[in-house]
Regions:
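Short acidic, S/G/P-rich loop/turn micro-motifs used as interaction or catalytic elements
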Residues: 15, 95-102, 129-138, 167-168
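Well-ordered, non-membrane alpha-helical segments in soluble/globular domains
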Residues: 99-111, 134-149, 202
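Conserved beta-strand segments of the P-loop GTPase G domain that flank and frequently precede/overlap
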Residues: 125-129, 161-163
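Membrane-proximal basic amphipathic "stem/tether" segments
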Residues: 222-282
Length: 282
């Protein structure tokens, strides 16, 4: 088992970050946590260039409209970089009104990641490939890792775990681990009416991470439960006696915006699932 002092997600989706979070390996939100990445190389190149053009208003185009549990999410895509933003805008909170606040939020997350990459000594990056894309080559993975290492010259260790979909897997399996680049196959694709969904089953991914790595200062199970309980307490306090049925509740929306909680399409009831937000509350 290898030990790191910082782990972060490069994408492709929120499933990678959620796998780290549920093990206590990550608490604060970072740029790639709630976005859709077009590729591993696109993510590392974005890190290398300091996220230039990441959220340029002129490049954002409405890409999809998703109906989730009574909530209508408006998905925007950056047509220059290929990154998608699925969790930021809705019919009730359109981009024309929310763009500045969302941009400021991502600026905080970008600054947070930059500080960590400049100061940490043992860094792990995780990329969970899209379940509908094939595995990329070892050369592409090694090249991506080289870009990351160039960005962190002070670090003693910068490793990359690349996980891709293989429906035959009953348990995540390491295929190769050379010079800090580890390739893992796992089954995490899910289906709805015979079609692959964008939501991943993280059980095999989380199981592999739990058995393979440790993070200095990771939250224990007791701390995770306490963290979750505190978020529910703050939610109840902010809502008074109101009962929450949908994400579109006005007071819940404001609380989520303030703390950057992702609750799209979920019913919020005690014990439902952990709530995650930026650790500084900004």
């Amino acid at each position: 088992m290898k030990t790191y002092d910082f782990a972060f997600s490069l994408g492709f989706s929120c499933a990678a970050s959620e796998s780290l979070r549920e093990l206590g390996f990550q608490k604060e939100s970072l740029p790639f946590d709630w976005t859709g990445a077009p590729s591993l190389r696109a993510s590392v190149d974005m890190v290398a260039c300091g996220f230039a053009g990441w959220f340029d208003r002129d490049a954002l185009r409405l890409w999809d409209v998703r109906h989730e549990g009574g909530f209508i999410a408006r998905v925007y895509k950056n047509m220059k970089t290929g990154f998608g933003f699925s969790h930021e805008f809705s019919n009730a909170d359109p981009i024309e009104r929310s763009y500045d606040a969302v941009r400021e939020k991502y600026e905080r997350r970008i600054s947070r990641l930059g500080r960590e990459l400049k100061t940490r000594r043992r860094i792990l990056a995780l990329y969970l490939e899209s379940p509908v894309k094939p595995r990329i080559s070892d050369g592409e993975i090694s090249a991506a890792l080289a870009v990351l290492r160039a960005k962190c010259p002070q670090a003693e260790v910068v490793d990359l775990v690349y996980i891709y979909e293989d429906e035959t897997c009953k348990k995540a399996e390491v295929l190769s681990s050379v010079a800090g680049a580890t390739v893992v196959r796992a089954h995490y694709r899910t289906y709805l009416d015979g079609r692959p969904m964008h939501i991943c089953d993280r059980s095999q991914v989380a199981g592999f991470l739990r058995e393979s790595i440790s993070i200095d200062g990771a939250l224990t199970e007791a701390q995770l439960r306490a963290f979750d309980a505190e978020k529910r307490r703050r939610l109840r306090a902010s809502l008074g006696t109101n009962r929450v049925n949908r994400w579109v509740n006005k007071k819940l929306k404001q609380w989520c915006r303030d703390l950057e909680v992702y609750l799209i399409g979920q019913k919020l009831i005690p014990g439902d699932r952990p709530l995650w937000f930026d650790g500084d509350g900004k």
